[in-house]
Every structure is written in C-alpha cells, then in structure tokens.
Curated annotation (Swiss-Prot):
Record comment: activity regulation: Inhibited by the neuraminidase inhibitors zanamivir (Relenza) and oseltamivir (Tamiflu). These drugs interfere with the release of progeny virus from infected cells and are effective against all influenza strains. Resistance to neuraminidase inhibitors is quite rare.
Record-annotated membrane-spanning stretches: 5-25
Necessary cofactors: Ca(2+)
Family matches, as Gene3D superfamilies: 2.120.10.10
Post-translational modification: N-glycosylated.
HAMAP family cross-referenced by the UniProt entry: INFV_NRAM
Positions of disulphide bridges: C64-C389, C96-C101, C156-C203, C205-C210, C251-C264, C253-C262, C290-C307, C393-C418
Name of the protein in question: Neuraminidase
Cellular component per GO, a single term: host cell plasma membrane
Function: Catalyzes the removal of terminal sialic acid residues from viral and cellular glycoconjugates. Cleaves off the terminal sialic acids on the glycosylated HA during virus budding to facilitate virus release. Additionally helps virus spread through the circulation by further removing sialic acids from the cell surface. These cleavages prevent self-aggregation and ensure the efficient spread of the progeny virus from cell to cell. Otherwise, infection would be limited to one round of replication.
Length: 441
C-alpha cells in the first residue's frame, strides 16, 4: 500500500542520515588525530636539520696543493651603484662557513651617487657599520645584514655560528664589541688608547676556537700587538707579542694543520711583510717573509730580501697576504711598486726562508693601469668543499674615487680567487666603473 511504501522510504532516509552523521564524526576524528600528530613530527624534523647544520670546523687539515688561482667572485658594485642602491664601502673581506661564503664590508652609512657619500674618504666615523651579503652580490640595503657598529672589523664562523668583531669609539679609547650568533658576548677595551684596530679580514677558527690579532699604538713606530683566543664569542686567553722592531697591522690569518699563520702589514719601516704563527695555546713564532720579491706597497724594486724588515720604501703600506707552503710562499701584491694599482700572484718556491728574488710562477689578476687596494686571505674548509684539505683563497679590493679620482666619495668593489690544482689563466678583472657619477658633477 501507499502507507507501507512511505514508511519504508522514511526508514531508509533515516538510516542514510544516521550513516552520514557517523561518516562526518569518523572523518572529524581522523583529522583531529592527524593534527595532534603533526607537531611532534615537525619538531623532530626541525631539530634534525639544526643538528646537521651545526658542525665544528676542525682546521686540522693542511692547505690544499695548488698550481694557480681560479676566479671565484666579482661584485661590480661601483658599476651597479651608478644607477642602483649600493652602499658606499671600504675594507671588504670574505669569510665562509660550512654552508656559504659571505662578503663583509664597512659601510659609510651612505649610498653611492647620493649626497651622504660626500667625504667618505675618512676611515673612522660613528656612521660606519659592519654588514654582510652573499658573496658576489653588490652590497645594498636589500640584500645586506647588519652585523656590528664598526670602523675596524673581523668575522669568522666556527661551524655553529658567526663571530663578529666590531671596533668603534674615539681614537683614544675605542672598544671592540664581540658578537656570537648576533648577540653581544664580550668586549675588548683599547689598552694603549691609540686607535685599537684589527684585521679587516676573517679571523681563523680551529676546533671550535677562533683567533684574531689586534694592534694598539702608533702607525709609524713601535706599537703593541695581541693575539686573542675566543670561544663562543668570549675571550678565553690573550697574549701580547714580544716583538721589538716589528710592526703588525691588518693581519691576514688562516688555519693550516691545526695552527694559525698571519701575514700582516708593516706600516713603520718594512716593505716586506711580517708574520706571526701560533698554536691553539697561543705559543707563537714571529718573523718577516725573507723573499726578495717584496709584498708591500710602496716598496723598492725586487732584489735581495731580508728575514727582518726591509727598510727602503718601508714607511706606509697596504693590507695584504701570503700563503706559506713549507719554505715556499705564494705572494699577492700590487703590480705597481708605488701606487695601489694592478695585482699579481707570485710563487717563490723558497721565499719564506731565502732572500733571493727568483720565482717560478706569476699570475696576473688586475692590470697595472687599473686601481686595486687592500687584499686579504680567506679559506674554505673541507666541511664546505668536500675536499680533504683547506682551500686557500684571497680577495682584492678595487678602490675607486678619492683621493686618486675626481669624485666626492671613496668606495670599492671586490674580486676573489681560490687556489686550484688545475689550469688557470692570467687576465685583468678591473672594477670597470666609468667616473665621475652624476653627484660629482
């Protein structure tokens, strides 16, 4: 009958509704259960990634054997800065963690082709800051990370975090602020009250400890020099060098077989470069590179060297570097003996210990007709490269503007090279910017 049919339809409809409600409840329970399980899985993955990303840069390997230098980066920052927002900088340097290489630089708190770039030939001001960006990129407000307030600086990575050292303050009482993972961890006060200053290149890390060299005192006479050992951004030991008649400024330091070697600038009376090497307990040795292939600028023509300071043209100087290989040495230097122009790498197979001026390899980096500037060393650890040795690298600052050119500003770009045991080439990789800029006219 019609009534029976309606009853059956009603029962079926009721059963479907009950089934639908059960289905919704089960689905909701499954989703809630999954949500409750997502967080611990996500946390586990996050912790695992952090564990993988943190290592100790041992620094126990020797420098890699090399035959020459392969171009690694060029930032073209002055060329780009004629139109784009690029910082006015000087004293750029490169440092690498086990994951990346970064360019560090001292800004002037100003952009190229802007009114605040006026007068930036000055070295020390309260506006100068240490910042960093990925290597090879032009330093701009859009890709750069603030590191420290500084007119002299250093930075390095121990495998866990970045250590930065930024010196700022008055000439007669500056303070170095140490930061680890971005947080202030320690300070070092000027002990001679005469322009405390440091490397302007990377510090060196071995087995979780990082090392730097600082200078305090005259730039044209006997000063005071200290080595500092730091762990997680705190000074754990320091030693003042007993180095009469030596002058150390702006040291370029690197690890080699668990020890540290630094090659520095003698601004007092040496046209060859002084060095200091030390172990992790800060037991040190000192000397000058003996080679008759002189590494500073200004300098005399190559001739007979000395294992002490070479006096002719010894006053003043420029930051530089060398890499020691046994009794041999790779010497980086300007091509011009009296101006900061050109750059070349020279292999002197006995130059660390012998005074003759013979060499076996010369590789051109920048032509003598183009400006260069400071240069310094950095290394790539096996944890970054996958090699079984520490790769030696260097950067060259290409200074433009004042005092040599008709601009209102002073700034620079940079290039870098790394040592390889394969084919390389001589060429010139200059800054290449056309000056003056609009702001200069």
């Amino acid at each position: 009958t019609i009534g029976s049919i309606c009853m059956v339809i009603g029962i079926v409809s009721l059963m479907l509704q009950i089934g639908n409600m059960i289905s919704i409840w089960v689905s909701h329970s499954i989703q809630t259960g999954n949500q409750n399980q997502v967080e611990p899985i996500s946390n586990t993955n996050f912790l695992t990634e952090k564990a993988v990303a943190s290592v100790t840069l041992a620094g126990n390997s020797s420098l890699c054997p090399i035959r020459g230098w392969a171009v690694h980066s060029k930032d073209n920052s002055i060329r780009i800065g004629s139109k784009g927002d690029v910082f006015v900088i000087r004293e750029p340097f490169i440092s690498c963690s086990h994951l990346e290489c970064r360019t560090f630089f001292l800004t002037q708190g100003a952009l190229l082709n802007d009114k605040h770039s006026n007068g930036t030939v000055k070295d020390r001001s309260p506006h100068r800051t240490l910042m960093s960006c990925p290597v090879g990129e032009a330093p701009s407000p859009y890709n750069s990370r603030f590191e420290s307030v500084a007119w002299s600086a250093s930075a390095c990575h121990d495998g866990t975090s970045w250590l930065t050292i930024g010196i700022s303050g008055p000439d007669n009482g500056a303070v170095a602020v140490l930061k680890y993972n971005g947080m202030i961890t320690d300070t070092i006060k000027s002990w001679r009250n005469n322009i405390l200053r440091t490397q302007e290149s990377e510090c060196a890390c071995v087995n979780g400890s990082c090392f730097t060299v600082m200078t305090d005192g005259p730039s044209n006479g006997q000063a005071s020099y200290k080595i500092f050992k730091m762990e997680k951004g705190k000074v754990v030991k320091s030693v003042e060098l007993d180095a009469p008649n030596y002058h150390y400024e702006e040291c370029s330091c690197y690890p080699d077989a668990g020890e540290i070697t630094c090659v520095c600038r003698d601004n007092w009376h040496g046209s060859n470069r002084p060095w200091v090497s030390f172990n992790q307990n800060l037991e040190y040795q000192i000397g000058y590179i003996c080679s008759g292939v002189f590494g500073d600028n200004p300098r005399p023509n190559d001739g007979t060297g000395s294992c002490g300071p070479v006096s002719p043209n010894g006053a003043y100087g420029v930051k530089g570097f060398s890499f020691k290989y046994g009794n041999g040495v790779w010497i980086g230097r300007t091509k011009s003996p009296n101006s900061r122009s050109g750059f070349e790498m020279i292999w002197d197979p006995n130059g660390w210990t012998e005074t003759d001026s013979s060499f076996s390899v010369k590789q051109d980096i920048v032509a003598i007709t183009d400006w260069s500037g400071y240069s310094g060393s950095f290394v790539q650890h096996p944890e970054l490269t996958g090699l079984d040795c520490i790769r030696p690298c260097f950067w060259v600052e290409l200074i433009r503007g004042r005092p040599k050119e008709s601009t209102i500003w002073t700034s620079g770009s940079s290039i870098s090279f790394c040592g390889v045991n394969s084919d390389t080439v001589s060429w010139s990789w200059p800054d290449g910017a056309e000056l003056p800029f609009t702001i200069d006219k």
